[in-house]
Regions:
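Short, solvent-exposed segments of well-ordered alpha helices
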Residues: 5-12, 36, 57-64, 79, ...
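Short intrinsically disordered terminal tails
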Residues: 1, 42, 102-105
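Amphipathic alpha-helical binding modules
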Residues: 68-105
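Amphipathic alpha-helical interaction modules
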Residues: 23-69
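Short terminal alpha-helical segments
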Residues: 1-39, 93, 97-98
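Generic preference for well-ordered secondary structure
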Residues: 1-5, 9, 50, 54-57, ...
Length: 105
């Protein structure tokens, strides 16, 4: 796949990165449930996805809502917010799946 700067990146490399990001998004759930740090990994994910948004031309329609939903997780810190947190995680996983389909067909 040709990305910004005319760099030709192998589809396998992008697929592996998307799989890793998907796993990291999913891991936010048990981290929060167990009282582990979930905010620092979330910040790292946001940084990576923002960078991906700058590199993957034509994927902004998916990456922007993904960034918005992940950023919104920082607001869901109360115990009663957990089900919304969980639902948002699964919506984000759906967006990463949609992104993979758009890239690979």
């Amino acid at each position: 796949m040709i990305i910004k700067y005319d760099a030709n990146i192998k589809d396998e490399s992008i697929a592996a990165n998307l799989k890793r990001i998907t796993n990291q998004i999913y891991k936010l759930l048990p981290n929060r449930e167990e009282g582990s740090d979930w905010e620092k990994p979330l910040s790292t994910l946001l940084e990576e996805i923002a960078g991906m948004d700058r590199l993957l031309i034509g994927s902004h329609e998916i990456l922007f809502p993904l960034l918005c939903k992940l950023e919104g997780l920082f607001l869901l810190t109360q115990e009663e917010d957990f089900f919304l947190f969980r639902r948002t995680i699964f919506e984000c996983l759906g967006l990463t799946s949609q992104l993979a389909k758009n890239i690979y067909g």
